[in-house]
A protein has these predicted regions:
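Short terminal hydrophobic/aromatic SLiMs and anchors at protein ends
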Residues: 9-17, 21, 36-37
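Short, positively charged patches
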Residues: 35, 39-179, 340
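Short, Lys/Arg-enriched N-terminal segments with co-localized hydrophobic residues
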Residues: 26-38
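Alpha-helical and His/Cys-centered functional microenvironments
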Residues: 6, 23-25, 29, 321
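Glycine-biased, small-residue-rich flexible motifs in mid-sequence functional cores and linkers
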Residues: 30, 40-42, 122-349
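Extreme N-terminal basic, low-complexity initiation segments
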Residues: 1-9
Length: 349
């Protein structure tokens, strides 16, 4: 049987079971086990958003804090001693103490609302299941727009310095994928990324832009893609794990963005990448996450195709038409899994 207690403002369950004439009591932090619905407690979200603005509080530290404290508000109000006891270290604990007086949780929440940005937690049923599988999954996702994040997705990435051939391929493949019911994911960078988003939009399909900055309009990067970002949010969505007012164009933020692009998708399609292109890093992430990597072959005389041709030599699947991708991912089976009920991963049980 289950009995709910509230002692000293710390709720917990006692699960009692007779075994060898003894009672075994299991103390459970309810925040760790419950799924949050779209009507999540506003207080919880406000404090989590505020914590996410503190330097050094990434997904790993956030999980440590949430496992130790009874609520996000308790974390926010904790003294140095208890923060250190949570296991996050004295340096980060001191940083939280120093930075939180300069952050107003309610004001930060109002900024989110003003920008029509909402938060998804990894315990939320809407949180993408594929992304939850990766070891570096964000604890918090910021989302602008509305769409099913568990729909089948393919990411398209490539060079900023594309050729006319690369542009033609990216647009055509994105358009055909969208027409086939696949959501096209990319990073809204110059070049292949932006062209892929445009192809999906022109097909009347769904596309997701994962950003390496926050979702407020003044920090959209590149700034020339502001109108594109509005179009994407209107029919698909923008995603980021960076809180409002995170400056645009910080180089270190792009690897964080890339792991979300790789984690969301069933597979990654690489269209034009130089020999040392950052796109290849994202392709390697996809392999680490057990995702398919597809590559479009290019001219052996083109610098922009050295990376993609090398990917193919290393085992990436050669793609010359959308049919190659659709056959590989078995779309009918994917659709069945997309509508399967959500389960709590074993790491969270």
């Amino acid at each position: 049987f289950h009995i709910f207690y509230l002692i000293d403002y710390y709720p917990y369950y006692i699960v009692s079971t007779p075994h060898n004439q003894k009672l075994f009591h299991i103390f459970v932090n309810p925040y760790k086990y419950c799924y949050h619905s779209r009507m999540q407690n506003k207080n919880i979200l406000q404090y989590l958003n505020a914590l996410n603005k503190i330097d050094g509080v990434g997904p790993k530290r956030m999980r440590q804090l949430m496992a130790f404290f009874i609520s996000p508000q308790a974390i926010w109000e904790a003294d140095l001693e208890n923060l250190v006891l949570s296991g996050i270290g004295e340096s980060l604990s001191q940083k939280i103490i120093e930075q939180r007086p300069h952050i107003d949780p309610e004001e930060e929440w109002r900024k989110l609302e003003k920008e029509n940005v909402r938060m998804l937690l990894e315990t939320d049923e809407e949180y993408p299941r594929l992304l939850k599988e990766i070891p570096t999954a964000p604890y918090i996702l910021y989302m602008k727009g509305e769409m099913d994040l568990n729909a089948p997705m393919i990411s398209i990435v490539g060079s900023r310095h594309h050729t006319p051939y690369g542009s033609q391929v990216a647009y055509a493949f994105a358009k055909e994928l969208a027409q086939s019911g696949i959501t096209v994911v990319s990073g809204m960078a110059f070049g292949i990324d932006s062209i892929a988003h445009r192809g999906a939009l022109d097909a009347g399909g769904k596309t997701i832009a994962v950003l390496g900055d926050s979702l407020d309009e003044k920090n959209i990067y590149p700034a020339s893609n502001l109108n594109l970002s509005r179009e994407i949010a209107g029919s698909g969505c923008l995603l980021s794990d960076f809180p409002i007012e995170t400056p645009a164009g910080i180089p270190g933020n792009f690897p964080a963005r890339n792991r979300i692009i790789a984690g969301l998708s069933l597979g990654k399609l690489v269209i034009e990448a130089g020999e040392k292109s950052g796109t290849l890093i994202t392709a390697n992430l996809a392999l680490e996450f057990n995702r398919d990597v597809f590559a479009v072959p290019g001219s052996i005389f083109s610098q922009q195709s050295l990376g993609t041709n090398n990917l193919i030599k290393s085992g990436a699947k050669t793609v010359t038409s959308i049919k190659d991708i659709l056959e590989e991912i078995n779309l009918e089976e994917v659709h069945k899994k997309s509508f399967a009920p959500a389960k709590i991963p074993s790491s969270q049980e």
